[in-house]
From Swiss-Prot:
Catalyzes the ATP-dependent amidation of deamido-NAD to form NAD. Uses ammonia as a nitrogen source. This is NH(3)-dependent NAD(+) synthetase. Its EC number is 6.3.1.5. Disulfide bonds: none annotated. Belongs to the NAD synthetase family. One of its GO terms (biological process) is NAD biosynthetic process. The gene is nadE. It comes from Chlorobaculum parvum (strain DSM 263 / NCIMB 8327) (Chlorobium vibrioforme subsp. thiosulfatophilum).
């Protein structure tokens, strides 16, 4: 498999995602959105698409730093705010997170990172209720498939326009949309603690895992065929385990079916398919 197999017609992607955002938001009876703007590439792309879809006045970005957040992240988030002319508010989560861990001083980095992510989502949904806007998601396909995110934290949203785009495809779309190179070229990081890096956490690069995921998902290749492409057995086994183990993160809560029409199984509300006026 060659790297270019992951390449998309990004003009076509843009032409799909812009009306997708507008139509889905309006289906739910909303006109505006709120999203977390971290200074990373994923939220920058979603912000760019939302502004083009709904207009800058209908997009609110929340900057939600913790005390260890890098200055660069805040600068890059502000760069997108200034570029697009969208509305923005800064809501630090330091007080909430530190108060939570006052009685849990031995909590691991993982637990602290999860609480940071959920504290940010708390801010987003509170603003959603305050302003009557819908929360846009910023999790990409690579993160969703690997379970590299916090359930009911950064993975929570009402509409996610980039959930079917691999991380490497997000970089391509970002270049197409004209996102500043400072955001595209920097090392991916959730900025949960000083020096944190996505690829260091995962133990492999996004380019490597996207190639493997593409073969597993889009090409539906079996293990032996994938290994014949030069993928290391241990790498394949680890990634497959992550995909299988984290299936629950990609689902709404499982409901036991007891009636003829069950939410999430065979009950559909009219707005799920009706044409929007």
């Amino acid at each position: 498999m060659e790297p270019q197999d992951l390449h998309l017609d990004y003009g076509l992607v843009e032409s799909i995602l812009i009306p997708f955002i507008r139509n889905e938001i309006r289906k739910f009876g909303f006109r505006s959105v709120v999203l977390g703007l971290s200074g990373g590439i994923d939220s920058a792309v979603v912000c760019e698409l939302a502004a083009r879809s709904l207009g800058a006045d209908n997009v609110l970005a929340l900057l939600m730093p913790y005390k260890t957040s890098s200055r660069e992240s805040l600068e890059h988030a502000q760069l997108m705010v200034d570029r697009l002319g969208i509305r923005a508010e800064t809501m630090p989560v330091t007080g909430v997170v530190d108060a939570f861990f006052e009685t849990r001083p031995d909590a691991s980095r993982l637990r602290r990172g999860n609480v940071m992510a959920r504290s940010r989502m708390l801010c987003l949904y509170d603003v959603s209720a305050r302003d009557g806007c819908l929360v846009l998601g910023t999790s990409n396909k690579t993160e969703l498939m690997l379970g590299y995110g916090t359930m009911f934290g950064d993975m929570a949203s009402a509409v996610n326009p980039i959930g079917d785009l691999y991380k490497t495809q997000l970089w391509g779309l970002a270049r197409h949309l004209g996102v500043p190179s400072e955001l595209i070229d920097k090392q991916p990081s959730a900025d949960l603690w000083e020096g944190q890096s996505d690829e260091a956490d995962l133990g492999f690069s996004y380019e490597e895992v996207d190639q493997l995921l593409y073969m597993m998902l889009e090409e539906r290749m079996e293990r032996d065929a994938i290994l014949a492409e030069g993928i290391a057995p241990a790498f394949y086994d680890r990634v497959r385990q992550m995909v299988v183990r984290n299936q629950y993160k990609r689902m709404m809560p499982v409901i036991a079916k007891l009636s003829s029409r069950t939410p999430g199984i065979d009950f559909r509300y009219a707005r799920d398919w009706q044409e929007m006026k």
